[in-house]
């Protein structure tokens, strides 16, 4: 065999030695990957419910903090002198950590907490983004290098005014009462009612999966963490609404589910009864949740991204009933607060939004289009 032929077709021993070397290299790569992917390099920690509840006790919550009781989020705690000062609840999609809502904690420590979180995330190849962040943090985030886009407005119902916006619902309220519907409030839902409300929830979902980001879901421990209002007809549970604790002066509602064949007005019936409960508990206002894309990009001088959202709001009814959602809240709302999506400079708005949409779409029903699922959860 010539030397040239030997170089092209080496002996079996050479091939075997090469395979051994390749195998060792692959094992080394696997070991390196496992080391880099180990928990020592993960950002944040899993839910530690008592630690999280302590933060809410000391600093009160936000409009998103109740959702963060679900064990599907990661938590980054900023500390000083070994004491928790600020916590961020987030989920990861791609290279983004999507923080849900406002930071929770000491107001004086928010800025250094965000800065440290950004630095720690950057070391691990992540970028921070905030979803449904309130107006009071927009300027701070801009100074820290974030771009932002408005994604809608949250409606607030004042519970202290003499003329309540929901008084107009009294005729519907009385009609349903006369038809045998009655409301009961439980500070903690009795165990014996779990099966009944679970049945309502299953029928309301109609085969769809629960979402995993930015909303609550039917979960036993989650349901027992706050008050629940139940509506019955002839002793049968036909609907329920759950309390969403926020602060000493404000509360919202989370799950509002009724059986499919019940009157459409039953949702209003549950809301009106909840308002009465909140008044008795001393709350000053009720958070009615987000009206997606409401009052976004309405002028000719608005940012391009917000102009696109405005077009979707006006002509995207085949995706989601944006305008009817806004109008349904409008009957109760006394003021609106803007909510924003903030993402770091250097990020593509298109790709950051796509990653957010994919995250929101987790758990979607197969028969629903991806676009519809995304826009439902904006």
Predicted feature descriptions by range:
Residues 98-108:
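Glycine-rich phosphate-binding "P-loop"
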Residues 32-99, 126, 131-148, 159-306, ...:
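A conserved beta-strand-loop-helix scaffold within acyl/acetyltransferase catalytic domains
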Residues 1-12:
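Membrane-interfacial helical/loop segments at transmembrane boundaries in membrane proteins
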Residues 14-39, 353:
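Alpha-helical membrane-embedded segments
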